[in-house]
């Protein structure tokens, strides 16, 4: 990757992330090169293909790094973060509306432009179907996961 292609993040965001890693050491796993590349790709994709989107929900948000990267590219975007793990949600609540709930049980309270599911590899087909069938009609959706079966809690591949 040439220096001109390196994503640029502002100082406050980097400080926020490092505070997060100090408070939550497992947050460091959100910063593997493959994680950052997939998140910056997705944020660029949203900016290019859904420029009019105003409110999105990120399912499997974990510590909100994807939300932060999207916010860098689309500053007016309202982002709602959902994760079943309450520990990371406490961190994301510092910056975004956040809820600790299983994604297939989430209740939509108002319209959203798009939903993003970043943890499909952690869901059984039954859970995935329940989540997918709950998405309001006319809502864009993005699925992003991985095919790393070396992780014990990965039950499916994308």
Which role fits each region the language model picked out?
Residues 51-54, 76, 111-112, 136-138:
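A general structural motif
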Residues 78-83:
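Conserved SAM-binding motif I beta-strand of class I
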Residues 112-126:
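A short SAM/SAH-binding and catalytic strip from SAM-dependent methyltransferases
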Residues 51-63:
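Conserved class I S-adenosyl-L-methionine
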């Amino acid at each position: 990757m040439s220096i001109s292609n390196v994503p640029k993040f502002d100082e406050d965001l980097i400080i926020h992330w490092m505070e997060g890693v100090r408070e939550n050491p497992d947050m460091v796993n959100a910063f593997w090169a493959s994680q950052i590349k997939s998140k910056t790709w997705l944020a660029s994709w949203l900016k290019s293909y859904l420029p009019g989107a105003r409110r999105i929900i990120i399912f499997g948000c974990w510590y909100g790094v994807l939300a932060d990267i999207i916010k860098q590219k689309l500053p007016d975007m309202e982002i709602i973060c959902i994760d079943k793990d309450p520990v990371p949600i406490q961190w994301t609540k510092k910056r975004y509306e956040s809820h600790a709930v299983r994604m297939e049980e989430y209740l939509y309270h108002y319209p959203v432009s798009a939903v993003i599911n970043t943890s499909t590899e952690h869901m059984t087909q039954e859970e995935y179907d329940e989540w997918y069938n709950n998405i309001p009609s006319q809502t864009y959706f993005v699925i992003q996961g991985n095919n790393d079966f070396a992780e014990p809690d990965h039950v499916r591949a994308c």
